[in-house]
Amino acid sequence: GLIGIACTAAKPMVAPAGAKEAFFGTNPISFAWPRKGSAPIVFDMATSTLAMGDVQIAARDGHAVPPGTGLGPDGNPSDDPKEIIKGVLLPFGGYKGSAISLMVELLSAGLTGDNFSYEAGAKDNNDEGPPKGGELIIAINPTLVAGNEWSDHSELFLTKLKNMDRVRIPGERRHKNRLDQGPRFINKEMLEKVKRLLE
């Protein structure tokens, strides 16, 4: 298997650290690490405090979001997801997350010649489809880089990590949940929307 790294510039909805207007996208980063005999390590994360989809779910379900998630349209901090949707998200980790968002912009748009988030926003046709932001995808053959022992060496590291108290490997719970064939629960509002779509 190959190691995968990807990042994407998206429609602007995140204010850089210290700013009050959107300039960065949520600029997700994805990572995948192959493992022999185990599910691969896979994670993806927005570089904002929450993904916009999570904010939209909180708004739909009437829940507040954690403090520091975003600013309302007045530029003031808010835990009301409906206000944040009208305002901006904030980068995770303050200026450090803002620097990672900057890195994603430069790698996915500056390096590839594709659209930065602000360009994707300006060119978006608002059809609810994905914006035309830049994307960088990297695939690495670990055997070519580290030799045949890369897997055993990495598994030793992961075993030591897992043996620490209350530590989980990213993607472990999600993979276990995907194997679960039990019943699923859908909130009432979502069920009603699905029923309306079927009419």
Q: Which residues does each predicted region cover?
A:
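Catalytic-core signal marking the mid-to-C-terminal active-site face
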Residues: 111, 116-199
